[in-house]
Amino acid sequence: MQQQYNPSAIESKVQHFWEENKVFKAVKDITKEKYYCLSMLPYPSGRLHMGHVRNYTIGDVISRYQRMIGKNVLQPMGWDAFGLPAEGAAVKNNTAPAKWTYENIEYMKNQLKVLGFSYDWDREITTCRPEYYKWEQWFFTELYKKGLVYKKTSTVNWCPNDETVLANEQVHEGCCWRCDTPVEQRDIPQWFIKITDYAEELLTQLDNLTQWPDQVKTMQRNWIGRSEGVEITFKIAGSNATLPVYTTRPDTFFGVSYLAVAAAHPLAELASTNNPALAEFIREAKNTKVAEAELATMEKKGMPTGLFAIHPLTGKEIPVWVANFVLMHYGTGAVMAVPAHDERDFDFAKKYGLQINQVIQPLDASTWDFSQAAFTEHGKLINSAEFDGLDFNHAFNAIADKLESLGVGKRQVNFRLRDWGVSRQRYWGAPIPMMTTEQGEVVTVPLKDLPVILPENVVMDGVQSPIKSDPEWAKTTYEGQPALKETDTFDTFMESSWYYARYTCPQYHQGMLDADEANYWLPVDQYIGGIEHATMHLLYFRFFHKLLRDAGILTSDEPATKLLCQGMVLADAFYYTSPTNERIWVSPTQVSLERDEKGRIINATDPAGHKLVHSGMTKMSKSKNNGIDPQEMVEKYGADTVRLFMMFASPAEMTLEWQESGVEGAKRFLGRVWNLVYEYVQQPATQALNALELNKAQKELRRDVHKTIAKVSDDIGRRQTFNTAIAAIMELMNKLNKAPLESDQDKAVMAEALSAVVRMLYPITPHICFELWQALGNQQTIDFAPWVVSDETAMIEDEKLVVVQVNGKVRGKITVPANASEDEVKITAKNDANVAKFLADMQIVKEIYIPFKMLNFVVKV
């Protein structure tokens, strides 16, 4: 063993051993309990960032711990390799997306290996490889045959200059990112998967995910958005047309003062035929693509159509408006507006001078100022004919019954969730396996012709997809007749919705999944990833699992038993303002700092001498130039130090503030562990530990060791509070550093302690522990060593500390044998000099004893 801790030499040697011996290869073994630990697979952008490192370190700590407690662990890694950034990078670097992607994968894979993650690299998946997406294409055709896939027109961003579809990310302030042409909304046919058929199950089975964060489940519940209401049909005055609307508040039905339809609603189109102003308003509204998240804050605009609807119960005419806050693809594309009892309807009515009719009264019969705001809570009905006086529940049912009896309404359960649009008019994605014959028949590509291969050797012009601009690519045959292949590609969420299952059998070629392997390993026992994926990836992930179950391939209902959402990694951000008033962000690695005595930054400058503004700790990002390169940190401090800091600096679910001083502290700690083991192994051979021969100090130290083992086991295994586990090991190390190494039993206790410390640290800092384990004389590598188990008898205390009070004030602390009786404790307390002083000449009226914690003498004053 070298005297000096040299991370780079140790880490490269240990990593070579792991790779050569395939130490982490996972093989199905029905005699062992399996454990599948999975971190969300990365997009191969070119470089790992600290967010990746945190995610994967957490996963690796869990995986290594689970191996040590005897589980058969699968921890794979792969690449979510399709996606729009590759197209942009290909144009910018004059290369093909495939070449750029594969080069990035190679680079990032080496970065992962340098960090020492215990992956089974034989299971590596790259989602842009035909052998992967072949089975995705096949499954899509199976869903189509089951009626779970359909095609319909849907709105996209269209650049009229480039004549191409733009992703939302390519629209900047309403204009094309490339040519600055105003973007239009255009309806084109697109493919959808019926996730709505699974809405109820996706919602109700959230209750079974007891080990998922409540925040994620709440976000999914809100996204699925189940509501119970009534669909009401209004007749349009002077025509045979009708207008269905859905409401969850039929109790407010008598307060409807206008109806609002989406700009794309057929009634709006009809009304605009001879109304140029309305036609222009509709055109403008259609071309302003609004994300649902922006609806609440955007300016509400509308225009009357000139049409009137007949209220089914009062017969009154109600104006129909076109409004920019109504979305065609939600509900019926129309809403009934009750300004007195809905804030949005109220604001719109005030703006355009529409009626505000109160029909709900507060339950306490107090008055409400309807000139200021809507009353949106439940209450009692007024101004509602025979329904006056009813509360919400009774009114809901009574009005629904009446509408149903008249044939103008029906109770309905609605979901906010929409079907999943999987078509993308991009190149770098898996081709959709559908064809259209010369007769216009849409058919699936048969299995024998799969995969439909995406050509990789292409030239990107930055405008059109190469498979769309090449008329030859689409040409094919179906049953001997000419046909055209679909030139859209899949949404990249398709690949990441089932990759976790393919990891169980990546070399299986007879089908999508080997059911035996998949059902042995699945569900995933621990999934790790950011909470930003709560309503997209994590929902599709659950949906796909249910599709695979219903296809008879999988037997479980949910893809992952436990979910951990790691917090973001933050770093200091600094900038100066340029002469053109632009903020120039400077990397924190380039900043010279002065701090006050409390550690606060009082001055910051860059190498050019600019005085910098410190904008605080913010998420590491390219835009603020405050990302820290993991590779630089590994080269400077070692992978184990980076891993240790990542796990110690913050609880896993909380944000982590990157502080290089903390990284330096982690390196110093590992140096102390190394030095203590080095000091120990220089001693002559140790005798076996004999618990009966231990003196008081040795017993106390051994007790601390085993208490630490118990705490660390619970913190890592059950609570997943890795930072507190590390803190406990550090506290123990402080005691071990002060412990003598003189007698045989001193050394024996130290041997047991160091064996425990090295094993407890191994999941977090595996390279140094690999080396220290061998230095301690173990023949088998630590990768196959069992987790250290606490000894209950070692934790039993010979003595207990009891706090002694007189009239509630602490007057002494006594040490008593752990088996002392209550009377013995009281006698010892009364004999304590300080306690005796306060009891002298006093009459004790009561003695309150909490065993081995506290004794209180109540005396007459």
UniProtKB/Swiss-Prot annotation:
Residues bound to ATP: 622
CDD domains, alphabetized: Anticodon_Ia_Leu_BEm, LeuRS_core
Domain of life, per lineage: Bacteria
GO cellular component terms given for this protein: cytosol
Motif annotated as 'KMSKS' region, chain positions: 619-623
Motif ('HIGH' region): 42-52
Entry-linked InterPro entries: aa-tRNA-synth_I_CS, aa-tRNA-synth_Ia, Leu-tRNA-ligase, Leu_tRNA-synth_edit, M/V/L/I-tRNA-synth_anticd-bd, Methionyl/Leucyl_tRNA_Synth, Rossmann-like_a/b/a_fold, tRNAsynth_Ia_anticodon-bd
Keywords tagged on the record: Aminoacyl-tRNA synthetase, ATP-binding, Cytoplasm, Ligase, Nucleotide-binding, Protein biosynthesis
Catalytic reaction equation(s): tRNA(Leu) + L-leucine + ATP = L-leucyl-tRNA(Leu) + AMP + diphosphate
Enzyme class: ligase
GO MF annotation: an example: aminoacyl-tRNA deacylase activity
Localization annotation: Cytoplasm
GO biological process, one term: leucyl-tRNA aminoacylation
EC id: 6.1.1.4
Family: Belongs to the class-I aminoacyl-tRNA synthetase family.
Protein name: Leucine--tRNA ligase
Organism listed in the record: Haemophilus ducreyi (strain 35000HP / ATCC 700724)
